[in-house]
Amino acid sequence: MRDLVKQLKSEKHTAEFDALRIKLASPEEVRSWSYGEVKKPETINYRTFKPEREGLFCAKIFGPIKDYECLCGKYKRLKHRGVICEKCGVEVTLAKVRRERMGHIELASPVAHIWYLKSLPSRIGLLLDVTLRDIERILYFEAYVVVDPGMTDLEPRQLLSEEAYLDALEEYGDDFTALMGAEAIQRLLRDIDVEAEVEALRTELQTTTSETKTKKLTKRLKVLSAFLESGNKPEWMILTVLPVLPPDLRPLVPLDGGRFATSDLNDLYRRVINRNNRLKRLLDLNAPDIIVRNEKRMLQEAVDALLDNGRRGRAILGSNRRQLKSLADMIKGKSGRFRQNLLGKRVDYSGRSVIVVGPTLKLHQAGLPKKMALELFKPFIFSKLQLRGLATTVKAAKKLVENEGPEVWDILEEVIREHPILLNRAPTLHRLGIQAFEPVLVEGKAIQLHPLVCTAYNADFDGDQMAVHVPLTLEAQLEARSLMMSTNNVLHPANGEPIIVPSQDVVLGLYYITRDRVNAKGEGMRFADAQEVVRAYENDQVDLHARITVRIKEGILNEAGEIEESDRLVNTAAGRILLWQIVPKGLPFALVDQPMTKKAVTKLLDFCYRNLGLKTTVIFADKLMYMGFHYATHSGVSIGINDLVVPDQKEAIISRAEDEVREIEKQYASGLVTHGERRNKVIDIWSRTNDQVAKAMMEKIAVEKVKDAEGKEVAQSSFNSIYMMSDSGARGSAAQTRQLAGMRGLMARPDGTIIETPITANFREGLNVLQYFISTHGARKGLADTALKTANSGYLTRRLVDVAQDLVVTEHDCGTEASIEMMPHIEGGDVVEPLRERVLGRILAEPVMDPKSRKELLAKDTFLDERRVDILEEHSIDRVRVRSAITCEARYGICSMCYGRDLARGHVVNVGEAIGVVAAQSIGEPGTQLTMRTFHIGGAASRATAANNIEVKSTGKIKLRNLKTVEQAQGNLVAVSRSGELVVQDLQGSEREHYKVPYGATISVRDGDSVKAGQIVAQWDPHTHPIITEVAGTLRFVDLVDGVTMNRQTDELTGLSSIVITSTKQRSASGKELRPMVKLVDKNDDDLFLPGGKVPAHYFLPEGTFLTKEDGTTVNIGDVLARIPQETSKTRDITGGLPRVADLFEARRPKDAAILAEISGVVSFGKDTKDKGRLIITAPDGTTHEELIPKWRHVSVFEGETVEKGEVIADGPRDPHDILRLLGVNALANYIVNEVQEVYRLQGVKINDKHIEVIVRQMLRKVKITQPGDTDLLQNEQVERTRVREENEKIIKKDGTVAKVEPILLGITKASLATESFISAASFQETTRVLTAASVAGKRDDLRGLKENVIVGRLIPAGTGFSYHQQRRAVAGKSVEEKEIEEKRVTASEAEQALSEALKSSAPQEAKAAQKDE
């Protein structure tokens, strides 16, 4: 018995560890792991099926095959444990040691490790400073290398071909040593003095000036210093001993029919052993050189194939013509060790089945089929049966359960009570894809799911399946109940809005009972209270939709949060009173007194959650659902073809549009408009027409005329089924209704361009063959896209999770002073996102002042909840500074003050919340949803008509910002700058609307004018870009040569001629140098200057420009000289969307990116090169910056214009790296957040900004060293921000110069691979490369992230595991401190003295005590 305890003790867990280190293994280390040398390639004996001795499965080396039984059977059972059998040499122990005991092979000749040779950059190559080709020539015996030149004039490391070697031998005899093969490389590596090399490189780096050399030296220095610091020896990259994997990890399994299935590794090992043994034999025989060499080369190839098959040369194929899986293949890729077995494992106690709807369940319940429950809860049932004495043994209990007697069902009921189960639906895109429920036993074989959680799971009941898991331990049950229960997940983690919201038929039911109808039965009745209304309705005295007057009791929350009751009379619809019956006290009646669309219901639940708490909300949501189902059934809403009402004006609208199109075709034929313009205009006409038809249809469908009580005709909202469904938000949208009863409109081709001829029919009328054919185009693309994009989106999510996985809230407050400024997001005059939504749930970084009284409204560090955001709105404050994830200075992770509200819970985020993963899921989840939804509108082109004017939406005053204008003769202003804005301020002076004013817009108001809502204040042509005169004078053409740089086009009808500039590509050689431009001169033919400067009024004309004026014409200020046609965009849906988001997060440099001004100053143009223009910016202090800009780029600044640093000079998509470099971190964050949000906003998806900020923070983790100062960092090295901070703190203590850095932006893939943790990086992508680099550097992984801890099988350092890790670290820290104190206290002589005294002392207890003190 004592032995047994000892045995169990010896098999306890491995010791606690804090970090993992990866290093190169020295030959000694490999031998120390090994339990014996594998000498034979045999695996098992074909007759006895026992492993061969000294073979690949040898029991003597690797351990016994059966538990506690040696191979020959002499020793069996536990009592002989630990004995080594003298007959077969096998140790008597557990068979599972065959999973952990390794062997080794002594190689007859050293072999290079392929990873350090071929994985780029080649480590061996860098160390030796020899090219990879040369190393391969040496290794594969094509050349000699001089190892020791001796007294000869050969260079060390010089390569000699066979002939050269023989010549050298003749010339110098044996004064020099030259070798080939891995021995040569090994010797070269052994001769490297790493320390001296590092010193030499550092000195050389300081003296060198050339860029390329610096780069090369830095690369070498990095690798060498890595070897120096890690204690790896270079020669260990050459193998002399090869470890052999334990046999149970490369099994040989007998199949039926006498054949064997074997792991590929066995084949690879066999080849190595065969070749090694043959080589040994040849060496013993002193075989001729050429044969030995060939054998050595074959051995090298065999080892290469074993380590990483296919990396060099052709891969070794197995019997069935497929590549053999090598050791490297075992760990990399989706089916490799990391992703298949370590990051995700299959779990026991789980089942799956089809789901069906459970409308009678409560929110916290799920229906579990009895059959499944019985199987899942088996162990619990067994123990209960034994406890009750119904069964004596497990076997008896098993029998009872199999017979399914009544006592078993009773016990199952008990076991299941309050034992939560987890339900999961694949794909689990965010954390709401797994939730906990209390099981309710149901008959049948399908799981019943509560309808309200379908949104969270994205589930429907068309055959979806779900998996059930049982949390076994008490802790697991507790977590499931308190954190994962569906009732605790009412809010969406991505945006903080309720996700337990009724949808579809429930909404339809609620909408139906809250509608009112003119002249319904019982209209105008008065009731004393709500109960009376219910009785009247039940006795058919009053209709659901009748307008009635009722006295209701209303409880409203006061400031203190108590409910104050009051009575009042309300005039409302009877159905709303029925709904009011179930509304909890504390909600105002106004929230119910309206048709309950989906938005209204969401608002109702949101208000309930914020004001009355979770419990009330959950109960209320359930009641709403029951009521919605009930009345949706009562309403009898359905769809018939007659519900699709086609408007009568449709024909007229369409024929009008056709006339317009014909008119434009005429203009095109006569050359008045270009091909591009014609196309744009036609598409615009049809887009507008489609909207008009849709509007007519909506007017027709949404309103019906009825007679009221007096017999007069009145209009009321229609009860048309389709209208009700789309209006309530239950199903369908205006866009879909438009296709059913309006016109289908323009279609897109698969490449996104729009087909000019629209489909004028709708689905009610039916499509003809041509229209149907055009439709299939877009529809089919939608289907193809869906398949591709689901994968894309999943991959994006994976990268996001990987980059953010180690970001956890680690402290309450980091104490930073940095912050970001928040403003409402305004686009084209619409406030797309008001300030309240952007700052809700954040922490103020600076106090907010009342703009009128200058009093402090809100203090610094205030948490902005709904109430405080209302205060901001009341005082119309439009910019505040708030804390942000980007500026947080927490050492690891982030602090809760910088993050703000936990969106899924509604309070400030708790320490330990894994916000990185939440952010990644919130951004990734809609990606998948959206991609799956491209095809729903059947590829109908929804291109917005191009904006061509500014119409003010609110009354107020005009302010013109950064706007340069010139005044035309008629008195209008014309904008001649690009970055100008027109702002509308309300009477309080707060900004309501912002509009970008494009170049060339005519503005009809002045700065400070008052405007009324609906007034048009600016106009322009959206399809062309004008060039406008800023001075009056006479035109002169320069370099405009007919037939060379320009062509005349004459309009036959009007006789007008216009001039078109030809593109440089089409010009003859002589014309390529010419730069067509127009200049303005005065009466004396002298150049005129632009106002306020010495810059001549020259206007360069890009290719494709239309000139409307002739040479010598007189022009006024603000006239249009020329027009540059603009091409239109393709349709943008999330297709453009998903790749766009990926590009932003990958920080890719866009093609033809915008060119930004590197410094602030005045623009001028210098001498051009062949195909590039030269733009010079001169700063006020006289420094200049030159920029070469390709000729075809449209430069948006003119000579003499002043630009600010970071302003756009040449149009194009902006490059995030430029923004970071020129405008700083905050501007970059702002740019990425807005760009990503725009993509999602187009799809109507709400994501809170802070999630995107969290990802951006991770992309900005690294900095580039610009000046290393006194630190050990290298120039231009990329280092973690925190590491630089640490190094600098050390230097400051010594009064040295600190390192200077600049932030750099890494794309999410790069950032994931550049993370400090090599385990996390290796399990993400490019496993081989990551592990190679890590092992050379002897990297240490502190296991700070979530992934690393999952991989080593620990609790994650987040959530409930956070405190466990904190305690563990604290204990570890304490023991280190104690050790240090001990070391400080006792000197060696003191210890010696104490020890001798202790030994002398007679009482042994004291001696023990003294030793303890030591």
Swiss-Prot record:
GO CC, one annotated term: DNA-directed RNA polymerase complex
Cofactor dependence: Mg(2+); Zn(2+)
Cofactor binding annotation: Binds 1 Mg(2+) ion per subunit.
Classification via Pfam families: RNA_pol_Rpb1_1, RNA_pol_Rpb1_2, RNA_pol_Rpb1_3, RNA_pol_Rpb1_4, RNA_pol_Rpb1_5
Listed InterPro entries: DNA-dir_RpoC_beta_prime, DNA-dir_RpoC_beta_prime_bact, RNA_pol_asu, RNA_pol_N, RNA_pol_Rpb1_1, RNA_pol_Rpb1_3, RNA_pol_Rpb1_3_sf, RNA_pol_Rpb1_4
Reactions this protein catalyses: RNA(n) + a ribonucleoside 5'-triphosphate = RNA(n+1) + diphosphate
Gene3D superfamilies: 1.10.132.30, 1.10.150.390, 1.10.1790.20, 1.10.40.90, 2.40.40.20, 2.40.50.100, RNA polymerase II, clamp domain, RNA polymerase Rpb1, domain 3
Binding site for Zn(2+) 2: 814, 888, 895, 898
EC number: 2.7.7.6
Residues at which Zn(2+) 1 binds: 70, 72, 85, 88
Biological process terms in GO annotation: DNA-templated transcription
Feature: compositional bias, Low complexity: 1392-1403
Source species, domain of life: Bacteria
Residues the entry annotates as binding Mg(2+): 460, 462, 464
Region (Disordered): 1392-1414
MF annotations from Gene Ontology: DNA binding; DNA-directed RNA polymerase activity; magnesium ion binding; zinc ion binding
Enzyme class: transferase
Signal peptide: none
PANTHER family: DNA-DIRECTED RNA POLYMERASE, DNA-DIRECTED RNA POLYMERASE SUBUNIT BETA
Described function: DNA-dependent RNA polymerase catalyzes the transcription of DNA into RNA using the four ribonucleoside triphosphates as substrates.
NCBIfam families: rpoC_TIGR (TIGR02386)
Family, per entry: Belongs to the RNA polymerase beta' chain family.
Cited HAMAP family: RNApol_bact_RpoC (MF_01322)
Protein name as annotated: DNA-directed RNA polymerase subunit beta'
Gene name for this UniProt entry: rpoC
